[in-house]
């Protein structure tokens, strides 16, 4: 199975900050990767598909990049509404696999 190693598992940042999280695939090529945002009690929301394509309606402060088998999600100019858990999903190889998630919290 392709393991998706996501880091960091938690992240504390201030409003206006730029934050980046990473998913690394343990193997495989041409991996199709999505990024999701999930808030407590809510269904996951698709942010980015194809590693870097922004889903319609998602603010442009979100961006995704691919570096071989490494994938990043960056949020620029962090807003209150961005505090959530983020996770990646590879859907190129069965079984499809998720990263462990990154919980983003506001720095006190």
Curated annotation (Swiss-Prot):
Recorded GO CC terms: immunoglobulin complex
One GO BP: adaptive immune response
Source organism of the structure: Mus musculus
Pfam families: V-set
PROSITE patterns: IG_LIKE
Record flagged with keyword Disulfide bond: yes
PANTHER family per the UniProt record, alphabetical: IMMUNOGLOBULIN LIGHT CHAIN (PTHR23267)
Other known facts: This chain was isolated from myeloma proteins that bind beta(2-1)-fructofuranosyl moieties (inulin).
Region (Complementarity-determining-3): 89-97
Region listing for Framework-2, in residue ranges: 35-49
InterPro entries referenced in this protein's UniProt entry, alphabetically: Ig-like_dom (IPR007110), Ig-like_dom_sf (IPR036179), Ig-like_fold (IPR013783), Ig_sub (IPR003599), Ig_V-set (IPR013106), IgV_Light_Chain (IPR050150)
Region (Framework-3): 57-88
Disulfide bond as UniProt keyword: yes
Keywords for the protein's UniProt record, in alphabetical order: Adaptive immunity, Disulfide bond, Immunity, Immunoglobulin
Superkingdom of origin organism: Eukaryota
Protein name stated in the entry: Ig kappa chain V-V region EPC 109
Ranges where the record places region Framework-4: 98-108
Region (Framework-1) location: 1-23
Disulfide topology: 23-88
Region (Complementarity-determining-2): 50-56
CDD domains in UniProt: IgV_L_kappa
Region annotation Complementarity-determining-1: where it falls in the sequence: 24-34
């Amino acid at each position: 199975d392709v393991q998706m190693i996501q880091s960091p598992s938690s992240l504390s940042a201030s409003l206006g900050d730029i934050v980046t999280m990473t998913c690394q695939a343990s193997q495989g090529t041409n991996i199709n990767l999505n990024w999701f945002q999930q808030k407590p009690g809510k269904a996951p929301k698709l942010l980015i598909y194809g590693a870097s394509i922004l889903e319609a309606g998602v603010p442009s402060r979100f961006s995704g990049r691919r570096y071989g088998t490494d994938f990043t999600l960056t949020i620029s100019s962090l807003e209150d509404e961005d505090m959530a858990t983020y996770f990646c999903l590879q859907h190129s190889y069965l079984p499809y696999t998720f990263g462990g998630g990154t919980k983003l919290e506001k720095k006190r």
